Amino acid sequence: MTSNEKEMGKSELLVVTGMSGAGKSLVIQSLEDMGFFCVDNLPPVLLPKFVELMAQGNPSLQKVAIAIDLRGKELFKSLVKEIDIIKSRNDVILDVMFLEAKTEKIISRYKESRRAHPLNEQGQRSLIDAINEEREHLSEIRSIANYVIDTTKLKPKELKQRISKFYLDENFETFTINVTSFGFKHGIQMDADLVFDVRFLPNPYYVEELRPFTGLDEPVYNYVMKWKETQIFFDKLTDLLKFMIPGYKKEGKSQLVIAIGCTGGQHRSVALAKRLAEYLNEIFEYNVYVHHRDAHIESGER
């Protein structure tokens, strides 16, 4: 939502959807704490009627978040159509947030909660089959989402913090860049738009006194950044991003996720993600956030 649209008093509608077990309930709870009027599991066919209520100017409906999932089954099929209808209006700003997680993580969460998956309420099939079917059903709505968040590696507190950064930031409407470091041995960053592999750089893991630390610590950071290869890579990377990022924004993208990966996600990727976020903050007026997904893992890089 832009500053001009805020001045015009347009209402905000956020549709929260995605995989069952990916964290929709937690996101809705967080948004409610931030002053959103929240509705859980509204049938998609009722979305236009709800927007009509919002358009009447009720102050309590100025910022609304609606969670929609496959519990509606057949009704869910109309969601993309209803969203297109709402986007054609000029009095309500609509965003779509899609939450997902790796299949094995969703299985783990369901085992912990002991709840039935919405596509397997009778227990007549395997959980993995239900998850795969749901992922297929959701592919279309995922493709039109403004924000895609992979919660596989996020603790509940970290997910809440990410939502808070989005919606408590006065400049959120401009453009958001998320820079993430990760370790390939722990899995690729699933929600990344751009992935850069820095495993070709000298590895601090093999310097015994540096091994226990991360790229956020000065000795490791200095070690990673001192090499000629690092400087050449960083210069080429920033030249590329200076060219690409304005194009993403021009095409209407509101969030860009840049992931930098090394082997374990503790040293090289952390140092470069830190430096890249600082650089992007210096040259752009966009919101730039940095997250180190695997830096806390004590085993380090291999």
Swiss-Prot record:
<dbReference type="InterPro" id="IPR005337">
    <property type="entry name" value="RapZ-like"/>
</dbReference>
<dbReference type="GO" id="GO:0005524">
    <property type="term" value="F:ATP binding"/>
</dbReference>
<feature type="binding site">
    <location>
        <begin position="18"/>
        <end position="25"/>
    </location>
    <ligand>
        <name>ATP</name>
    </ligand>
</feature>
<dbReference type="GO" id="GO:0005525">
    <property type="term" value="F:GTP binding"/>
</dbReference>
<keyword id="KW-0067">ATP-binding</keyword>
<comment type="similarity">
    <text>Belongs to the RapZ-like family.</text>
</comment>
<dbReference type="InterPro" id="IPR053931">
    <property type="entry name" value="RapZ_C"/>
</dbReference>
<feature type="binding site">
    <location>
        <begin position="69"/>
        <end position="72"/>
    </location>
    <ligand>
        <name>GTP</name>
    </ligand>
</feature>
<keyword id="KW-0342">GTP-binding</keyword>
<comment type="function">
    <text>Displays ATPase and GTPase activities.</text>
</comment>
<dbReference type="Pfam" id="PF22740">
    <property type="entry name" value="PapZ_C"/>
</dbReference>
<keyword id="KW-0547">Nucleotide-binding</keyword>
<dbReference type="InterPro" id="IPR027417">
    <property type="entry name" value="P-loop_NTPase"/>
</dbReference>
<dbReference type="InterPro" id="IPR053930">
    <property type="entry name" value="RapZ-like_N"/>
</dbReference>
<protein>
    <recommendedName>
        <fullName>Nucleotide-binding protein SE_0548</fullName>
    </recommendedName>
</protein>
<dbReference type="Pfam" id="PF03668">
    <property type="entry name" value="RapZ-like_N"/>
</dbReference>
